[in-house]
């Protein structure tokens, strides 16, 4: 804690003379609020019992716009309509609400983030995974395949990371099945390749490095066809198409939802 700086500007909404604790945003705005409200509405912002806070200022990492919204959810008043704000502002508020466990804000942010999924699927997926919202995790589980194992380890809670790795492993098995199929094409259908035939197969296999690529297999094959001037090996193309319409489709149908691993 520290004292008020000369350059600090006091929030117009949160500048009451009877406040008993002050917070400073990262952009130098002071919010003078009441400990009683913090104790009721938040587990992460209320000071310990018996501490004196009137003359102290607590610096937070959030900006003034985010704290302005966050503190409004700690007072008995009509709450701001979050549908009128840009997505980044909503996402910043959602993170702050989770960080400081402001329950009233957490619930409304969850609802608004779900509504934002069609326009911001990856960001909503990361929010759901970081904070363990099972309904949004299932809704965005295919997007979760785009997360690298390193990012997942660094970003997710331990129980969510374990669930993600088990879900991801199902897709790794499918990816291994695909590459095993491509190595046996010549065994099941002996034939020869010209240069363009080889280019097509190399382009397809080279593009399927991570599980997320399996969802784009059709467009990957189309891109490979263009790369080899539409000269495609009939046997290889049929094998890939059969695997996609058979093994891949069946594997996805019997796959467990991400939330099943929580």
Per-region residue spans from a language model:
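Alpha-helix N-cap/N′ positions at the starts of helices
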Residues: 65, 85-89, 119-120
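Short, well-ordered secondary-structure elements
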Residues: 60-76
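A short alpha-helix capping/helix-loop junction motif
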Residues: 85-86, 103-110
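Ankyrin-repeat interhelical turn detector
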Residues: 98-101, 132
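Non-membrane alpha-helical segments in proteins
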Residues: 31-33, 39, 69, 88-95
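Solenoid-repeat scaffolds in large eukaryotic assemblies
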Residues: 90-93, 105-106, 136-137
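Amphipathic alpha-helical repeat scaffolds
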Residues: 91-95, 110, 114, 122-126
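BTB/POZ-protein C-terminal extensions
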Residues: 1-32, 36-40, 46-60, 79-80, ...
């Amino acid at each position: 804690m520290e004292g008020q700086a000369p350059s600090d500007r006091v929030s117009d909404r949160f500048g009451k003379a009877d406040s008993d604790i002050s917070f400073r945003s990262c952009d130098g705005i002071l919010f003078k609020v009441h400990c009683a409200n913090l104790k009721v509405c938040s587990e992460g912002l209320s000071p310990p019992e018996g501490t004196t806070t009137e003359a102290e200022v607590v610096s937070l990492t959030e900006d003034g716009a985010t704290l302005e919204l966050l503190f409004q959810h700690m007072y008995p008043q009509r709450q701001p309509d979050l549908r009128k704000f840009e997505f980044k502002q909503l996402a910043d508020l959602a993170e702050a609400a989770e960080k400081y466990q402001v329950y009233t804000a957490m619930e409304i942010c969850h609802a608004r983030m779900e509504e934002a999924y069609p326009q911001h699927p990856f960001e909503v997926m990361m929010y759901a995974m970081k904070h363990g919202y099972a309904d949004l995790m299932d809704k965005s589980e295919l997007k979760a395949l785009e997360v690298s194992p390193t990012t997942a380890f660094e970003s997710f809670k331990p129980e969510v990371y374990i669930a993600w790795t088990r879900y991801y492993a199902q897709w790794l098995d499918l990816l291994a099945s695909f590459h095993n199929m491509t190595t046996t094409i010549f065994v099941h259908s002996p034939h020869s390749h010209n240069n363009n035939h080889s280019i097509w197969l190399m382009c397809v296999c080279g593009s399927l490095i991570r599980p997320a690529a399996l969802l784009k297999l059709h467009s990957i094959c189309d891109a490979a066809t263009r790369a080899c001037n539409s000269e495609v090996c009939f046997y290889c193309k049929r094998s890939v198409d059969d695997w996609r319409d058979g093994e891949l489709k069946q594997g996805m149908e019997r796959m467990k939802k991400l939330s099943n691993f929580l």
